[in-house]
Amino acid sequence: MWLHRMATAGLLAVWLAAFCAQAQEPLLNQAAQHKWMQFSIASGRVTLEGTRVGNIQSNNSNSSGRREQLNVRNDNGEPAMTYERTNADESLLFDFASGDRVRIRRTPKGAGSVVPMEFVQLPNEKLVLTLGPADHQQAYQAASLWHLLIAQPQPCKQHLVPVLEMLRPDWKLAETAAKVEQRLLQGVGGDVAAQRSRWAAWIEQLGNDRFAKREAADRALRAADPSVLSYLRQLEFGRLDAEQQFRVRRIIDALSGQSSDDSPEQVAATLSGDPTVWLALLGRPEPSTRQTAARQLVALLGEPIGVDPAADPATQQTQREQLRARIEEK
């Protein structure tokens, strides 16, 4: 234990010395470059997985007026980090706390032209991206970061992605979202109704009186196409008995934790069964994309969607909002 503490202290001393030697480089950039903190996007949630140092608190400033504070700590047994940076034009905050809590805020200062931005991620809640000053705010909500990037590509590319990629410059989030969308459009055409019918039968079987039947259904759902995860998350748990609820939650937890960093293939497979994703694609400018999305929504919902992808833009918008209300009621 003593040797471990000494080694950690030695690493920390080297790290802080490197910061001091490169004071013109922001602390967060240095931390990202040397990978002292491990960030990932898992199941569409931004996560601080771990750190290579213990508790640290560092302050830094330079001649140009930039001031920074970096605090890395243990929060209820989980890694946590707060980073604040201010200069003449803007202030920036990253706050990662235990329990999947993330808050990122960017605000202009003085004559700064930065658009105010806040990104909030809380446990078991939708992500919220808020843009604009207090008297003219626009808020976007989504089930995951990938939902948000697909539903609101331009605001995200312009305001959110550049800030998130300060944590991991190799993320290439806009490029990954484009690959997800491409795979979604290329991967349609299977018998969605038959697939969902099989899943529904297995979920029903999770409540069977015979243990062997319940175990067989459990194994089948775990081995199903990755898009089953989205289907399971949309279930109305109030309609399931206690055994079904217990098993479905365990399956969701297991499937959600299979990879530490989302890949385009995994994301596309997961989102392919989510009507809200296809509703977003139904609003794309490309006619072929709208037509594909319309067909997929009919298959997923099992009924006419009431949206004509060839209608004039105003009519399409009205019809999509009506469809959105129907989807949210389900």
Task: Show where each model-derived region lies.
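Boundary at the C-terminal end of the N-terminal hydrophobic targeting segment
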Residues: 20-23
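N-terminal secretory signal peptides that target proteins for export/translocation
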Residues: 1-5
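Bacterial N-terminal signal peptides
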Residues: 8-18
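Extended repeat-based scaffolds of very large eukaryotic assembly and lipid-transport proteins
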Residues: 25-330
